[in-house]
Amino acid sequence: MKWSWLILVGILCAIVFETTHAMSLQEYAEKPFGRVLMLRHALAPGFGDPSNFQLRDCSTQRILDEVGREQSRQIGNAFRNAGLRFEGVYSSQWCRCLETARLINVGEVEELIGLNSFFQGIVQREATLASLRKFLQDLPPDGDPVLLVTHQVTISAITGMGVSSGAAVAYDPVSDQAQRVTLPTD
């Protein structure tokens, strides 16, 4: 009985530690965890997208406000100040993600359909995640990290972690492990 109690307490402590421990951006820059830094787009007020959503028409989408634009610039400055370099910068095709990635300004931004939001069924969840998993699987295990600017649902589906706007999770596709990275805007 005593051992089962200790095991239960140990498991609970491990769960709490796993969900609360985050590495600082400086720690991540000095020793990146995995090859991928997943970033949720910066603040875009509202919930979901309007019913008239069209992929290439930002006027039909929820977009960054000025606070979100400033948040994006601050994230980019924090990346540069930490000396963080990215091998590639990839973004969802949604306007709020593309604008976040461009305002961060740490490299040429490439659209990646595997980063698109399947929250409202605009794209199919399984096909989108299959595309992203293929991209992650094809990443060489060594090299500078890649930055993926995407949505809450995508980050959660891959890492099991929820994130707020402008928050980051480091992900290792080889071990399928993830760790939060604290940004100055958190």
Question: Model segments located where?
Answer:
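Short, surface-exposed amphipathic charged segments that create phosphate/polyanion-binding patches used
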Residues: 123-131
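Active-site-proximal alpha-helix that buttresses catalytic centers in soluble enzyme cores
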Residues: 23-113, 118-121, 161-186
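Generic beta-sheet signal
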Residues: 34-36, 144-150
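Bacterial N-terminal signal peptides that target proteins for export
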Residues: 1-7
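N-terminal signal peptide c-region/cleavage motif recognized by signal peptidases
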Residues: 17-19
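Bacterial N-terminal signal peptides
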Residues: 7-15
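A short, acidic, amphipathic alpha-helical segment used as a generic capping/interface helix at domain edges
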Residues: 130-140
